[in-house]
Amino acid sequence: MAAVLEENGCSRQSSPGAGDSDAEAGDTARHKLESLLNRNMRIEMTDGRSLIGCFLCTDRDCNVILGSAQEFLRPSDSFPVREPRVLGLAMVPGHHIVSIQVELESVTSPQYI
Protein backbone atom coordinates (compact mmCIF):
# COMPACT_ATOMS: atom_id res chain seq x y z
CA MET A 1 0.00 0.00 0.00
CA ALA A 2 1.20 3.48 -0.84
CA ALA A 3 0.10 6.79 0.62
CA VAL A 4 -1.33 9.25 -1.89
CA LEU A 5 -1.44 12.99 -1.21
CA GLU A 6 -4.59 14.54 -2.65
CA GLU A 7 -5.09 18.12 -3.88
CA ASN A 8 -6.65 19.22 -0.59
CA GLY A 9 -3.67 18.00 1.43
CA CYS A 10 -5.33 14.84 2.77
CA SER A 11 -3.57 11.55 2.38
CA ARG A 12 -5.14 8.17 1.72
CA GLN A 13 -3.92 4.62 1.26
CA SER A 14 -4.01 3.02 -2.16
CA SER A 15 -3.13 -0.43 -3.34
CA PRO A 16 -0.74 -0.94 -6.27
CA GLY A 17 -2.49 -1.02 -9.64
CA ALA A 18 -5.77 0.36 -8.30
CA GLY A 19 -4.77 3.98 -8.77
CA ASP A 20 -5.70 4.19 -12.44
CA SER A 21 -9.32 3.07 -12.04
CA ASP A 22 -9.74 5.16 -8.86
CA ALA A 23 -8.41 8.23 -10.66
CA GLU A 24 -10.73 7.70 -13.62
CA ALA A 25 -13.75 7.25 -11.35
CA GLY A 26 -12.78 10.35 -9.38
CA ASP A 27 -12.38 12.38 -12.57
CA THR A 28 -15.78 11.24 -13.83
CA ALA A 29 -17.47 12.15 -10.55
CA ARG A 30 -15.70 15.49 -10.47
CA HIS A 31 -16.80 16.33 -14.02
CA LYS A 32 -20.38 15.35 -13.18
CA LEU A 33 -20.39 17.65 -10.15
CA GLU A 34 -18.82 20.47 -12.16
CA SER A 35 -21.57 20.11 -14.77
CA LEU A 36 -24.15 20.68 -12.02
CA LEU A 37 -22.60 23.91 -10.74
CA ASN A 38 -24.89 26.94 -10.97
CA ARG A 39 -27.86 24.76 -12.00
CA ASN A 40 -31.17 25.02 -10.17
CA MET A 41 -32.11 22.00 -8.11
CA ARG A 42 -34.79 20.84 -5.71
CA ILE A 43 -33.70 19.05 -2.54
CA GLU A 44 -36.25 17.01 -0.60
CA MET A 45 -35.39 16.72 3.10
CA THR A 46 -36.24 14.12 5.75
CA ASP A 47 -38.63 16.48 7.57
CA GLY A 48 -40.76 17.00 4.46
CA ARG A 49 -39.42 20.39 3.45
CA SER A 50 -38.18 21.12 -0.06
CA LEU A 51 -35.51 23.64 -0.95
CA ILE A 52 -35.08 25.04 -4.44
CA GLY A 53 -31.97 26.99 -5.28
CA CYS A 54 -28.78 27.26 -7.28
CA PHE A 55 -26.20 24.51 -6.59
CA LEU A 56 -22.98 26.17 -5.45
CA CYS A 57 -20.90 23.47 -3.78
CA THR A 58 -20.75 20.24 -1.81
CA ASP A 59 -18.21 18.50 0.41
CA ARG A 60 -17.09 15.01 1.41
CA ASP A 61 -19.97 14.69 3.88
CA CYS A 62 -22.50 15.34 1.07
CA ASN A 63 -23.54 18.68 2.56
CA VAL A 64 -24.91 20.94 -0.16
CA ILE A 65 -24.82 24.74 -0.43
CA LEU A 66 -27.68 26.35 -2.37
CA GLY A 67 -27.75 29.99 -3.38
CA SER A 68 -30.96 32.02 -3.70
CA ALA A 69 -32.75 29.19 -1.91
CA GLN A 70 -36.47 29.08 -1.21
CA GLU A 71 -38.09 26.75 1.31
CA PHE A 72 -41.37 24.98 0.62
CA LEU A 73 -43.25 23.21 3.41
CA ARG A 74 -45.20 20.02 2.84
CA PRO A 75 -48.92 20.84 3.03
CA SER A 76 -50.77 19.12 5.88
CA ASP A 77 -54.13 19.35 7.64
CA SER A 78 -52.93 22.13 9.94
CA PHE A 79 -50.78 23.95 7.35
CA PRO A 80 -52.26 24.65 3.92
CA VAL A 81 -50.02 25.33 0.92
CA ARG A 82 -48.21 28.60 1.59
CA GLU A 83 -45.89 30.92 -0.22
CA PRO A 84 -42.25 29.87 -0.20
CA ARG A 85 -39.95 31.31 2.43
CA VAL A 86 -36.86 33.02 0.99
CA LEU A 87 -33.69 31.74 2.65
CA GLY A 88 -30.94 33.09 0.41
CA LEU A 89 -27.77 31.08 1.01
CA ALA A 90 -28.59 27.72 2.62
CA MET A 91 -26.52 24.75 3.76
CA VAL A 92 -28.33 21.41 3.69
CA PRO A 93 -26.71 18.68 5.81
CA GLY A 94 -26.11 15.56 3.74
CA HIS A 95 -27.75 13.23 6.27
CA HIS A 96 -31.05 15.16 5.87
CA ILE A 97 -31.19 14.86 2.07
CA VAL A 98 -33.75 12.39 0.72
CA SER A 99 -33.55 13.27 -2.98
CA ILE A 100 -32.07 15.82 -5.34
CA GLN A 101 -33.68 16.81 -8.63
CA VAL A 102 -31.82 18.95 -11.17
CA GLU A 103 -33.75 21.41 -13.33
CA LEU A 104 -33.76 20.64 -17.03
CA GLU A 105 -32.44 23.30 -19.38
CA SER A 106 -35.75 24.87 -20.35
CA VAL A 107 -36.78 28.36 -21.34
CA THR A 108 -40.43 27.91 -20.35
CA SER A 109 -41.26 26.59 -16.90
CA PRO A 110 -38.81 24.78 -14.61
CA GLN A 111 -38.95 21.02 -14.98
CA TYR A 112 -36.96 18.71 -12.76
CA ILE A 113 -35.46 15.32 -13.59
Curated annotation (Swiss-Prot):
What family classification does the UniProt entry report for this protein? Answer: Belongs to the snRNP Sm proteins family.
Q: What is this protein called?
A: N-alpha-acetyltransferase 38, NatC auxiliary subunit
Question: Pfam families in the record, alphabetically?
Answer: LSM (PF01423)
A cellular component annotation (GO) from this entry: nucleus
- SMART domains annotated for this entry? Sm
Top-level taxon in the UniProt lineage:
Eukaryota
Q: Which UniProt keywords apply?
A: Cytoplasm, Nucleus
How does the record describe its quaternary structure?
Answer: Component of the N-terminal acetyltransferase C (NatC) complex.
- Key word Cytoplasm present: yes
> Which PANTHER family does the record match to this protein?
N-ALPHA-ACETYLTRANSFERASE 38, NATC AUXILIARY SUBUNIT, SMALL NUCLEAR RIBONUCLEOPROTEIN-ASSOCIATED PROTEIN B AND N
Q: Where in the cell is it found?
A: Cytoplasm; Nucleus
Q: What are the boundaries of the region Disordered?
A: 1-29
Functional description taken from the UniProt entry: Auxillary component of the N-terminal acetyltransferase C (NatC) complex which catalyzes acetylation of N-terminal methionine residues. N-terminal acetylation protects proteins from ubiquitination and degradation by the N-end rule pathway.
**Every Sm domain range:** 28-106
What's an example of a GO molecular-function annotation for this chain? Answer: RNA binding
